Amino acid sequence: MKPEIHPKYTKVTVNCANCGTTFETRSTRNNNIKVDICSKCHPFYTGKQVLVDTAGRVDRFNKRFAKAAPKASAQ
């Protein structure tokens, strides 16, 4: 291996934004790493399914654009 061309491999702290878990690992990044979701809180690993209620958003979208549809067809 050539000297002085490889990145330094240091210890970094990984912080989960969802559950607040922190753990140490090694990486070529110099600073801490923030992740949105980790293995402690991910539904695949925990076995808990989180349902996202999008029905209200879809209904609101359809109502908003149902009013706009007759105006477009009248022209």
Curated annotation (Swiss-Prot):
Q: Which GO terms describe its cellular component?
A: ribonucleoprotein complex; ribosome
User: Cross-referenced InterPro entries, in alphabetical order?
Assistant: Ribosomal_bL28/bL31-like_sf (IPR034704), Ribosomal_bL31 (IPR002150), Ribosomal_bL31_A (IPR027491), Ribosomal_bL31_sf (IPR042105)
Q: Which domain of life is it from?
A: Bacteria
Protein's UniProt keywords contain RNA-binding: yes
Q: Which UniProt keywords apply?
A: Ribonucleoprotein, Ribosomal protein, RNA-binding, rRNA-binding
A Gene Ontology annotation in the biological process aspect, one of them, is:
translation
- Which Gene Ontology molecular function entries are recorded, alphabetically? rRNA binding; structural constituent of ribosome
Pfam families cross-referenced by the UniProt entry: Ribosomal_L31 (PF01197)
Record carries keyword Cell division? no
- PROSITE patterns of this UniProt entry? RIBOSOMAL_L31 (PS01143)
State what this protein does: Binds the 23S rRNA.
Quaternary state and partners of this protein?
A: Part of the 50S ribosomal subunit.
Protein family per UniProt: Belongs to the bacterial ribosomal protein bL31 family. Type A subfamily.
NCBIfam families linked: L31, PRK00019.1, PRK00528.1
Q: What is this protein called?
A: Large ribosomal subunit protein bL31
Origin species, per record, is: Chlorobaculum tepidum (strain ATCC 49652 / DSM 12025 / NBRC 103806 / TLS) (Chlorobium tepidum)
